[in-house]
From Swiss-Prot:
Annotated keywords: Cytoplasm, Methyltransferase, rRNA processing, S-adenosyl-L-methionine, Transferase
Gene Ontology annotations of biological process type: rRNA base methylation
Superkingdom, taxonomy of origin: Bacteria
Similarity-based family: Belongs to the methyltransferase superfamily. RsmH family.
Gene3D superfamilies for this protein: Putative methyltransferase TM0872, insert domain, Vaccinia Virus protein VP39
EC number: 2.1.1.199
Enzymatic reactions: cytidine(1402) in 16S rRNA + S-adenosyl-L-methionine = N(4)-methylcytidine(1402) in 16S rRNA + S-adenosyl-L-homocysteine + H(+)
Protein name (Swiss-Prot/TrEMBL): Ribosomal RNA small subunit methyltransferase H
Length: 332
């Protein structure tokens, strides 16, 4: 079998994730299992600390290939793991179902989400995620999902495409690129391959590094739309926080500003107590914040890690902890 590190990316900020999440026995959830790199490190840390016997790791991924590889990676810890196909936005139901089967209370000690597309998906031409490789214009993280990138590129009108590229790609040339795609469709028919779309984009972008940035932004926008990534992320953050046990933690690794903005806002919202309208002068808030930040600012990878793993360059890690009602973090 090909080594996991050869087909899936090396786990980003893995030492920091383990240090923040693994502190006691309990249920741990890796909602973006991938090749199992982060999960393997967490399970090893649980074992080394003597916590493994009282712990369970639930790994969730939409990708059948990821689940197969992760199963091989984690076979040493098979008795302490449950791997399940699903979307992390459904983690609440998945956790409840698995815990019910095992007679466990569905209270989680640690949740990890490592967002974005995996290197394996990027490097597999048939998945259609990369503008560098010829393949069908697909971009579905779940290969059984109904809508592909080709459906969007060929089904949206010019205004819808422009809005998409600007909203999810923050692309300044969104209108001209959308116009060029529609013109191409009218002349040549449907756009069905990644290199076909890349050629259209290159013809409507400035030279040099700006072309690469434009390609990245447009492909990012399509991937987000195909997989409803930002809506899924919001749902997962709310559900995940609800699943946390008291003192349980959630760690999120994001890779672009749209993701990080959502994580920051949801964490801030859940940490905020509601004191009602100004001037009321309540002795206690109407409702207490349910989490507290563990990282006041997002953590980034050290230069040494970036040198070894370029994907770490844009990674940001934010961590929160479930707190007592009206209290501070139990660890403080």
């Amino acid at each position: 079998m090909v080594m996991v590190r050869d087909i899936f990316h090396e786990p980003v900020l893995v030492n920091e994730v383990v240090a923040f999440l693994v502190r006691k026995p309990g249920i741990y959830v890796d909602g973006t299992l991938g090749g199992g790199g982060h999960s393997s490190a967490m399970l090893r840390a649980l074992f080394d600390a003597g916590f493994l016997a009282g712990s369970l790791l639930i790994g969730i991924d939409q990708d059948d290939a990821a689940l197969r590889v992760a199963g091989e990676t984690l076979k040493e810890f098979a008795a302490s793991t449950v791997l399940v196909k699903g979307n992390f936005c459904d983690m609440g139901g998945l956790i409840a179902s698995i815990c019910a089967e095992k007679g466990l209370e569905p209270k989680v000690m640690g949740i990890l989400l490592d967002l974005g597309v995996s290197s394996f998906q990027i490097n597999t031409p048939d998945r259609g995620f990369s503008y560098l490789r010829e393949g069908p214009l697909d971009m579905r993280m779940d290969s059984n999902a109904s809508r592909s990138a080709a459906d969007i590129v060929n089904g949206y009108d010019e205004q819808e495409l422009a809005r998409l590229f600007y909203r999810y790609g923050e692309e300044p040339r969104s209108r001209s690129i959308a116009r060029a795609i529609v013109a191409y469709r009218q002349k040549h028919g449907a756009v069905t391959y990644t290199q076909e779309l890349a050629a259209i984009i290159r013809g409507n972008a400035h030279g040099g590094e700006k072309v690469i940035k434009t390609l990245s932004r447009v492909f990012q926008a399509l991937r987000i739309e195909v997989n409803a990534e930002l809506d899924v992320l919001r749902q997962a953050l709310y559900d995940g926080i609800d699943c946390l046990d008291e003192t349980g933690r959630m760690a999120i690794i994001s890779y672009h500003s749209l993701e990080d903005r959502i994580v920051k806002r949801v964490f801030a919202e859940k940490a905020r107590s509601d004191w009602g309208p100004k001037g009321v002068g309540l002795r206690e808030p109407l409702s207490w914040g349910s989490v507290a930040p563990v990282t006041r600012k997002p953590l980034i990878a050290a230069p040494d890690e970036i040198a070894l793993n370029s994907r770490a360059r844009s990674a940001k890690l934010r961590v929160i902890e479930k707190i007592h009602e009206g209290g501070r973090r139990a660890s403080e």
